Regions:
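N-terminal (or domain-start) structured segment
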Residues: 1-83, 120-121, 128, 132, ...
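An extracytoplasmic/periplasmic, membrane-proximal ligand-sensing/linker region
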Residues: 2-3, 142, 229-295
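A structural signal for short loop-to-beta-strand junctions that line the ligand-binding cleft
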Residues: 59-61, 78-96, 123-125, 208-212
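Beta->alpha turn/N-cap motifs
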Residues: 62-68, 91, 126, 154-155, ...
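Periplasmic solute-binding protein
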Residues: 69-76, 90-104, 137-142, 218-221
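C-terminal lobe and pocket-closing loops
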Residues: 92, 106, 177-244, 273-276, ...
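Flexible hinge/capping segments at coil-to-helix
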Residues: 99-120, 203, 209
Length: 295
């Protein structure tokens, strides 16, 4: 039995993943249904990170997104999700498709139509992130359009270029875009979820704009591969009960995030299906004309 469980977040304090994991941990700790859960922020490159995953006692959990799939598909030398044990999916955070403030006739339908006519006519930024690349590829796959992709080292650089009017459209977090949209610095085109966001309720969904499909950042927790199934199921149960607490849903909604719970088996199938779907999407993209990338 674990006296306490460390929930390792490979991002800084205050990041979206950190906020979501702390909300869950605090909800579980208040209920007192199991060992105390402590959120630990550790970078992937640190020696401490390696020590954590050398432990097989089930007392360490790892917060993750679909980046485990995206990173491996981009570089087969990267760890694959199946090296770990899926415990539970916890949340889904839709994204916001936006246009620069000065773009005329800025609707998603108009932007897509323009890109379909001329793939070099609509510029979009992309950071050097495999997960961000998959989100952009999802938008292209759903619309059939190809955009003129400008590559940046970081998401912050790409976002700054969008605000400066150097790009036509972008895919950003709903919370990051809210203030910019309200101040007319950006124009909201669509949210990438099935339902409208409570953060920006006036913004239509992709479906409302005539586009079938959704994409989002999905967060969950993993354990070491050797963690006993019984222990993984017990831990998942704590998070499942927390997911049913209305106050948690309200708290996450402030960040444009929806509570979505999947247990160990369902979360495993989720990763299997996501890997297959993204591999097929990559093959479809490769079968079409090479996208122009400018750095």
């Amino acid at each position: 039995k674990c006296i306490s469980i460390r929930l390792v977040v490979p991002h800084s304090v205050g990041s979206a993943t950190d906020v979501i994991m702390r909300a869950y941990a605090e909800t579980i700790n208040r209920r007192g249904s199991g060992p105390l859960i402590k959120v630990i922020n550790v970078t992937k490159k640190s020696v401490k990170w390696q020590r954590i995953w050398s432990k097989t006692d089930g007392c360490n959990l790892f917060a993750t997104t679909q980046s485990l799939v995206a990173d491996h598909l981009a570089n087969k030398r990267k760890p694959i999700w199946s090296w770990l044990k899926p415990v539970a999916m916890l949340s889904r955070t839709p994204l916001l498709v936006v246009a620069r403030g000065g773009l005329k006739d800025a609707t998603l339908a108009n932007v897509v139509e323009k890109a379909l006519q001329d793939p070099n006519s609509v510029g979009i930024g992309e950071a050097r992130s495999p997960l961000e690349r998959m989100m952009l590829m999802s938008l292209e796959d759903m619309t059939g359009a190809r955009f003129r992709i400008m590559t940046y080292d970081t998401g912050r650089e790409s976002y700054s270029a969008l605000l400066a009017g150097k790009l036509d459209i972008g895919i950003i977090s709903i919370t990051a875009g809210r203030r910019r949209v309200e101040h007319k610095e950006l124009q909201a085109l669509a949210v990438s979820s099935e339902a409208r966001s409570s953060v920006l309720p006036a913004v239509p969904t992709l479906k409302e704009e005539g586009i079938r499909g959704t994409f989002s950042i999905d967060r969950g927790i993993m354990a070491s591969k050797e963690t006993p199934d019984e222990l993984a199921a017990e831990i998942a149960g704590w998070f499942e009960k927390a997911s049913e607490v209305p106050e948690l849903a309200d708290r996450l909604a402030e960040y444009g995030t929806i509570v979505v719970y999947k247990g160990p088996d369902e979360y495993t199938r989720y990763f299997e299906n996501l890997t297959a779907d993204w591999q097929e999407m990559i093959q479809r993209a490769a079968g079409k004309q090479t996208r122009r990338r400018a750095s």
